[in-house]
């Protein structure tokens, strides 16, 4: 891209920002998107910088289709116009040809997100009812399965015997938030976001303790109903293969009571998936057996449609085999005759499945199909609710920019919170979904920042303590006019002084030694300015080098023998010093003679002509060469 094009793109952003500030009106994401280069591929950094530029300037960024929003649109001629959108419908959609081809993930994400209409209160209620209806259908279907009944009994026994925690059985958060209505109060959120996790942890523990007796009582009732239903189901299964017998049983009327009790408990997703996993596993095994039987029948000339007509809806047992042996079609007779052992084995395997599920094969398949259909209905409704509120995630995520996570990571974490909000939303409360979801999105983002933003992870409870101390420090700075000391902060928070100092030390952010210093490329890196304790200081290296040179010149004024003796005795220019005995062996003289030569040489060095050259190094102590320093002391 040429410099002129870059300047033109920057001019569009600056022009949009300038006019928005002068008119004191907000902009939308579409306005920023349109101001970016259309037929280019703007990077993620460019998009983030554009959004942050408006946010730092104090210009509000609104959604494209928000109630009663004032929309600022910029065209190619850069003329601005005001319009009010009250019908929650997108007005000035970007033309497809203007978007251009792009493979930038952020641009594509915003484009797809902008194509989904926002929901009115009525639409939110409609989707929430679809989710609720799908969930109710699934719960009702699960309660009709003896597999689920056995699971309920086992869970009750594990809970009573303390083999299972309550939080592993039910959704504690749903119970904890059952009586709370989160407010979308930005001012309060900024003050309390630092204490969310600690309060939530305490609240969940408190809720778990409070509701445990009630849950045990409910589970006891559920287990009792399930035991009665299992006994009745077994009797009906043994007496007759007609499913209507079980349905018409008087004790089976307890099924509605079981459904109501299970719906009130709110089992968590893991427990529901445990039951579904067992049922789906049996269903897959059943499908594999039926598929193998169909392929075998086709080898004998039985058409697929004829096989389905005779197999589907029939109770596969010995009576069915006798019936098919009398079938008028030769293919069936041949199949039943030649594959008699295979048919008997399949009947036995189906009988095992029926005893395991407590239902006839056809009834079990219908039950699984009903559950799968309700799951698809629920997932589609949740998908619609999530896609319609993705703009809300971006509007919240931009407030947490520059806190250690990339903008895209903030969006993804916010989306996770949005999905949790969809699962917990109760439309009967009367408030809009966006009001409820804001709390979940903000919690997901703040938790992600606490867990992932730092290079060295700090536990969440310590993060909250750090935030509390930093918040108190800012308040005291405004009150006192100077930075408060650790003692003053400890007194204000009634916290031990050692703990405050420890937390303030932990709060320091790590910094890379490769960070550039200055604006110039030649400014170097931060690591260049950190002292290396193991390296020789430049002044010490200079003194050592100078001392070595002076010592060499002074020793050169002695006789070669005297110089050699002193060098060996003090280790000057050598790896180590030598004893009198070792030097004597080198010169083949006695120790006493070496001592005399050494004494004579030292007296010569003490002469003012020689000593004045070395005295200047004595003031520096032993910063220079250790061996040369020993010579100075001598």
UniProtKB/Swiss-Prot annotation:
Q: What Gene3D superfamilies does the database record attribute to this sequence?
A: RNA Polymerase Primary Sigma Factor (1.10.601.10), Sigma-70 factor, region 1.1 (1.10.220.120), Winged helix-like DNA-binding domain superfamily/Winged helix DNA-binding domain (1.10.10.10)
Cited function: Sigma factors are initiation factors that promote the attachment of RNA polymerase to specific initiation sites and are then released. This sigma factor is the primary sigma factor during exponential growth.
Among InterPro entries, the record links this protein to: RNA_pol_sigma-70_dom, RNA_pol_sigma70, RNA_pol_sigma70_r1_2, RNA_pol_sigma70_r2, RNA_pol_sigma70_r3, RNA_pol_sigma70_r4, RNA_pol_sigma_70_non-ess, RNA_pol_sigma_70_r1_1
Map out region (Sigma-70 factor domain-3) in residue numbers.
464-541
Region annotated Sigma-70 factor domain-4, chain positions = 554-607
Q: What ranges does the record give for the region Disordered, renumbered to this chain?
A: 177-202, 608-634
How would you summarize the oligomeric state and partners of this protein? Interacts transiently with the RNA polymerase catalytic core.
Motif Interaction with polymerase core subunit RpoC in this chain: where? 409-412
Q: Which Pfam families match?
A: Sigma70_ner (PF04546), Sigma70_r1_1 (PF03979), Sigma70_r1_2 (PF00140), Sigma70_r2 (PF04542), Sigma70_r3 (PF04539), Sigma70_r4 (PF04545)
Name the keywords, alphabetized. Cytoplasm, DNA-binding, Sigma factor, Transcription, Transcription regulation
Query: Which PROSITE patterns does its entry note?
Result: SIGMA70_1, SIGMA70_2
Residue ranges flagged as DNA-binding region: 580-599
| Main localization of the protein described in the UniProt heading | cytoplasm
Q: What is this protein called?
A: RNA polymerase sigma factor RpoD
The molecular function terms in GO held by this entry are: DNA binding; sigma factor activity
| Cell location | Cytoplasm
**Highest taxon of the lineage:** Bacteria
Which protein family is named in the record?
Belongs to the sigma-70 factor family. RpoD/SigA subfamily.
What ranges does the record list as Acidic residues composition bias? 182-197
The GO annotation for biological process reads:
DNA-templated transcription initiation
GO CC terms, sorted: cytoplasm
Tell me the segments the record calls region Sigma-70 factor domain-2. 385-455
């Amino acid at each position: 891209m040429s410099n002129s094009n870059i300047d033109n793109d920057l001019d569009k952003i600056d022009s949009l920002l300038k006019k928005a500030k002068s008119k004191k009106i907000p902009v939308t994401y579409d306005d920023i998107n349109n101001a970016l280069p259309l037929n280019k591929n703007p990077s993620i950094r460019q998009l983030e910088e554009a959004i942050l530029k408006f946010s730092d300037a104090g210009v509000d960024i609104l959604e494209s289709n928000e109630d009663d929003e004032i929309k600022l649109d910029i065209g190619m001629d850069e003329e601005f116009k005001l319009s009010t959108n009250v019908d929650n419908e997108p007005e000035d959609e970007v033309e497809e040809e203007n978007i251009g081809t792009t493979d930038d993930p952020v641009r594509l994400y915003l484009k797809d997100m902008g194509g989904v209409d926002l929901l009115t209160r009525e639409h939110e209620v409609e989707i929430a009812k679809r989710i609720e209806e799908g969930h109710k259908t699934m719960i009702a279907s699960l309660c009709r399965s003896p597999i689920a009944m056995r699971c309920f009994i086992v869970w009750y026994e594990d809970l009573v015997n303390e083999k299972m925690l309550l939080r592993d059985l039910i959704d504690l958060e749903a119970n904890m938030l059952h009586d709370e209505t989160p407010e979308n109060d930005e001012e309060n959120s900024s003050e309390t976001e630092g204490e969310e996790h600690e309060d939530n942890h305490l609240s969940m523990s408190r809720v778990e303790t409070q509701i445990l007796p009630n849950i045990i009582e409910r589970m006891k009732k559920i287990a009792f109903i399930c035991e009665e239903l299992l006994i009745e189901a077994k009797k009906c299964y043994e007496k007759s293969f007609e499913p209507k017998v079980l349905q018409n049983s008087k004790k089976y009327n307890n099924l509605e009571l079981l459904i109501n009790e299970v719906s009130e408990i709110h089992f968590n997703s893991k427990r529901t998936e445990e039951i579904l996993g067992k049922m789906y596993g049996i269903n897959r095994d059943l499908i594999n057996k039926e598929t193998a039987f169909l392929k075998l029948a086709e080898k004998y000339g039985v058409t697929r449609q004829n096989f389905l007509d005779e197999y589907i809806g029939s109770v596969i047992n010995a009576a069915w085999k006798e019936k098919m042996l009398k079938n008028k079609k030769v293919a069936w007779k041949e199949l039943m005759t030649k594959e008699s052992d295979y048919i008997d084995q399949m009947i036995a395997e189906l009988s095992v499945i029926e005893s395991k599920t407590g239902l006839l094969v056809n009834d079990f398949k219908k039950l699984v199909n009903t559950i799968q259909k309700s799951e698809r209905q629920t997932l589609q409704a949740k998908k619609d609710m999530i896609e319609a509120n993705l703009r809300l995630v971006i509007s919240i995520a931009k407030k947490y920019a520059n806190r250690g996570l990339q903008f895209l990571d903030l969006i993804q974490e916010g989306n996770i919170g949005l999905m949790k909000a969809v699962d917990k939303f109760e439309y009967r409360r009367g408030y809009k979904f966006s009001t409820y979801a804001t709390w979940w999105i903000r919690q997901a983002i703040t938790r992600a920042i606490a867990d992932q933003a730092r290079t060295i992870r700090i536990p969440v409870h310590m993060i909250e303590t750090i935030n509390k101390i930093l918040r108190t420090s800012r308040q005291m700075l405004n009150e006192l006019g100077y930075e408060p000391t650790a003692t003053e902060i400890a007194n204000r928070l009634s916290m031990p002084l050692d703990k405050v100092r420890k937390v303030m030390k932990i709060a320091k952010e790590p910094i890379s030694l490769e960070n550039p210093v200055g604006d110039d490329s030649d400014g170097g890196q931060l690591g260049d300015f950190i002292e290396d304790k193991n390296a020789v200081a430049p002044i010490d290296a200079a003194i050592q080098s100078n001392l070595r040179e002076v010592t060499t010149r002074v020793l050169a004024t002695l006789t070669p023998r005297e110089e050699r003796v002193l060098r060996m005795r003090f280790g000057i220019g050598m790896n180590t010093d030598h004893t009198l005995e070792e030097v004597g062996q080198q010169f083949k003289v006695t120790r006493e003679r070496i001592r005399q030569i050494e004494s004579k040489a030292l007296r010569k060095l003490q002469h003012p002509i020689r000593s004045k050259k070395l005295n200047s190094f004595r003031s520096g102590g032993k910063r220079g060469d250790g061996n040369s320093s020993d010579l100075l002391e001598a």
